[in-house]
Amino acid sequence: MIASGRSPSRLPRTGRLLLALGMVVVSAVGVGRADDAPIDAKCVREVLKRSVLLLQKSAATYIEKKDCFSCHHQALPAIAVARAKRAGLSVDAELTGEQSDFTHEYFGGRAKRVRVGEGVPGGPYNAGYALWGLHADGRKPDSVTNDLVAYLKTKHRRDGSWRIRTHRPPLEDSDFTATALSLRGLQLYGGKAGAKDLAERIPRTQNWLLKTEAKTNEDRVFRLVGLVWAGGKSDDLERLAKELIKQQLPDGGWRQLAEGTSDSYATGQVLFALKTAGIKVG
């Protein structure tokens, strides 16, 4: 089970990708089921090596068949692969570069529309994930990232939130996800010129995150992650972390919905959120 260091369904098409992502995240924080025997580190690394390769190959196959950017085949794999690389796992640099170029070119081709608040099919959620993925790939700020930043600014609501446009659970269904990712995108690529603007936006976003009810695992995860990124107070972060920890099931995992069973996506993202919040797990 999870211990705090402070006071504190089967998926369609993307299932294997999300499973692999969950495995990468779980490995990063070193968590196993409470009733399991100790996990052999060499075995874990071998599984992760295969998972990273699967992520990269699946993403490569996607761009052979599709011409649109996706969070599940470009952004999330980019983030997971970058984390795997930092953990000392080998990755295919050529495939990583191809994915980054694909994302960059996709939004570059929509520049005129994007910079005026149009041309992003998935809305703020999509733009936020794109910026996070590009940053994970090591992309420097340029006209494409500037346009995505401008897009996100046009979509920020007076109440401090960014709203989800398309509802395709579990990955794409939550205003909390859209809000956290949009804020992160502005932080990663807003630059010094955008610092004052960002400082004016953050308090509204913090307020929305704290006052809006979280109903699903996705909501709770990105509520916590968003508040971390927004520089929330430690007491608030601990309270939200406890809410997540309370949802852990006897098998050691988490579920997406109250009536569901535990799965790798829900479990992996909770562990990521807790680690992001500085909560000791394992």
List where the protein language model places each region:
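N-terminal secretory signal peptides that target proteins for export/translocation
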Residues: M1-R13
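Preference for long, amphipathic alpha-helical scaffolds in soluble/luminal domains
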Residues: I2, G30-G282
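Bacterial N-terminal signal peptides
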Residues: R16-A28
